[in-house]
Amino acid sequence: MARQNEIEIQTRIGRQRITLDKIIHFPRGLAGFEGRHDFTLLQLREGAPFLVLQSLDDPGLGLLVADPYSFLTDYQIRVGDPEQRLLKLENIRQVAVLVTVSIPAGQPEKTALNLTGPILINHRARIGLQVPQTDASLPPQFYLHMDDANGSTTVRRKASPPAAGEDKGDVQE
């Protein structure tokens, strides 16, 4: 039973209790989900690099997200003044940057970060905003190689998945 300062929802990863101070409001929604405004972040596993950005408006909607800096040290985004005002940013340290992660069914080797649609969250004001990036030098996706056998992640320094038999040019991180 949920307490007065929390809500309880059934999600694709099970029943979750969400305290009201963990709700993040997205005034514009997200790309493709403009009508969904209230979300929370759910941890899948302790220490895992991935989270679920869970909609509270639609409990069936949860997006896999990750901190891009866990995989890329040189990822840069541009945030204009209107977006900074909407996020109520007073200091850059108030913002967390996340990117959506796609894992095609049955093809974990094609796990990719979406670098062109970062999600910014002002953790103090609990406001979120997706800020599309238009930098042509930025690859739209950044492919990861997930190795369940030893729990490691290998980063592919290329913008497309490997072809069959192709040397992956992997760098361990």
Swiss-Prot record:
Coiled coil stretches, renumbered: none
Any one GO biological process: bacterial-type flagellum assembly
InterPro entries reported for this sequence: Flagellar_assembly_factor_FliW (IPR003775), Flagellar_assmbl_FliW_dom_sf (IPR024046)
Protein's UniProt keywords contain Cell membrane: no
Region described as Disordered: spans on this chain: 152-173
Alphabetic keyword roster: Bacterial flagellum biogenesis, Chaperone, Cytoplasm, Translation regulation
Its job: Acts as an anti-CsrA protein, binds CsrA and prevents it from repressing translation of its target genes, one of which is flagellin. Binds to flagellin and participates in the assembly of the flagellum.
Alphabetized HAMAP family for the sequence: FliW
Protein name, UniProt field: Flagellar assembly factor FliW
Organism: Nitratidesulfovibrio vulgaris (strain ATCC 29579 / DSM 644 / CCUG 34227 / NCIMB 8303 / VKM B-1760 / Hildenborough)
Gene assigned in the entry: fliW
